[in-house]
């Protein structure tokens, strides 16, 4: 009897571990499950000046919407001259989890890893004239995530040649939360 109980316990644990692993998706993405509210958590680039204060790629996601043609519509905030402003970008689907958008050059990004209820990791390549750089973004469903997920992002960035010093933890700065859910411009005093 004890052996049977131990066997059942072992199978239950193995089953729950397998189910937890299935939460992470790396292909065959369901865009409808990506839709909704998100928070920018971490930002990384091999050209750090693009993600530093006043950098063109220092943006904060608020919302992702899926359009009828499978494009993704993003609502972002960014700071311009110390003011938080909203802006929108529509990204055209070109493959499974692969999208393009014109923004400070031509951008192609790929969903690397998604846990629909917790986080999204994106890898973007920007080409602007003869200059090219990479950008990695980590979005969470909540304003912050567990340290182990941040560590995972650091490891993934390093696999793409982005050093730890080029990763910015956006949870430590003003992410223009005062504009979330509204539309417009608002002064921001913190950074």
Swiss-Prot record:
Summary of the tissues where the protein is detected: In the submaxillary salivary glands of mature male pigs, but absent from that of females. Expression was much lower in submaxillary glands of castrated male pigs than in sexually mature individuals.
One Pfam family, short name: Lipocalin
Cysteines engaged in disulfide bonds, as pairs: 84-176
Gene Ontology cellular component list: extracellular space
Gene3D superfamilies: 2.40.128.20
Glycosylation site residues: 69
Signal peptide: 1-16
Subcellular location: Secreted
Highest rank taxon of the organism: Eukaryota
GO molecular function per UniProt: odorant binding; small molecule binding
Main location class: secreted
UniProt similarity note: Belongs to the calycin superfamily. Lipocalin family.
Subunit annotation: Homodimer.
Protein purpose: Binds pheromones, the pheromones are released from the saliva of males and affect the sexual behavior of females.
Stated name of the protein: Salivary lipocalin
Species name: Sus scrofa
Gene label: SAL1
């Amino acid at each position: 009897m004890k052996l049977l109980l131990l066997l059942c316990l072992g199978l239950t644990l193995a089953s729950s571990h397998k189910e937890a692993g299935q939460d992470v998706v790396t292909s065959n993405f369901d865009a409808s499950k990506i839709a909704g509210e998100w928070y920018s958590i971490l930002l990384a680039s091999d050209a750090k000046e693009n993600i530093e204060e006043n950098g063109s790629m220092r943006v904060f996601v608020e919302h992702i919407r899926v359009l009828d043609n499978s494009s993704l519509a993003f609502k972002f905030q960014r700071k311009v001259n110390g003011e938080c402003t909203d802006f929108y970008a529509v990204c055209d689907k070109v493959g499974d989890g692969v999208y393009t958008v014109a923004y400070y050059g031509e951008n192609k990004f790929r969903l690397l890893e998604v846990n629909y209820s917790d986080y999204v990791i994106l890898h973007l390549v920007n080409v602007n004239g003869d200059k090219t750089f990479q950008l990695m973004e980590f979005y969470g469903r909540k304003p912050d995530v567990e340290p182990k997920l941040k560590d995972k992002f650091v490891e993934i960035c390093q696999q793409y040649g982005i050093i730890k010093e080029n990763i910015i933890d956006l949870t430590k700065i003003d992410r223009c939360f005062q504009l979330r859910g509204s539309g417009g411009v608002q002064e921001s005093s913190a950074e």
